């Protein structure tokens, strides 16, 4: 199966000093290389402890399902590691994590909400986190990540990289390492890297947070959304993987 459709993966391997390497140290030893997926150690770009991860439900015509095995990730504070291979959400309480491949992330962006920076993601659906819609277009799953108290850095992460902007910057660097490998065969220019964009988009009405029981609660503040929703007046800066149909807000299902 193409890496483009790599799914979220459950893991019990926590990043440690023995199996990771700070990006600055790695570049000092290997300045001409920026990815070590074939080696034993993961490269750590940024990360920290004390984040809340929320699945958003903006479209009433879309049904989202979550594998019960990964539900704790969305119920409590988690640690976050931006690795060269994936974005890792780790539950210290339950001693497991969810690896999010960068190929799975359609869009990652920054938004400012209630005087707080929030990381906004759009993911392609899969077995672990799925979405079905009545629309003719394939749905994306929207996730927000924000800092919570108590919040701190982690010993194996570079100092000062536990902020949401630092998490975003680390993801931007790592995402650029992973080109989509399943672009349309009709295109002659091959695979394309993620492209910097500025999005002036937001949901034009309040969205609902998605509880684990999939019942929506009213949200007090609009949530910035991406390509397949109505737009309003707030702005976010983000980075999006280019689909093979850039002129459409989402890919039409076959």
From Swiss-Prot:
Keywords attached to this Swiss-Prot or TrEMBL record, sorted alphabetically, are: Cytoplasm, Nucleus
Say where the protein is mainly found. cytoplasm
Highest taxon in the source lineage: Eukaryota
One GO cellular-component annotation of the UniProt record comes to:
spliceosomal complex
Q: Which Pfam families match?
A: Voldacs
The record's subcellular locations are: Cytoplasm; Nucleus
Keyword Cytoplasm applies: yes
> What InterPro entries is this protein classified in?
ICln/Lot5/Saf5 (IPR039924), PH-like_dom_sf (IPR011993)
Q: Which GO terms describe its biological process?
A: mRNA cis splicing, via spliceosome; spliceosomal snRNP assembly
**Family note:** Belongs to the LOT5 family.
Q: What is this protein called?
A: Protein LOT5
Which species is listed as the source? Answer: Meyerozyma guilliermondii (strain ATCC 6260 / CBS 566 / DSM 6381 / JCM 1539 / NBRC 10279 / NRRL Y-324)
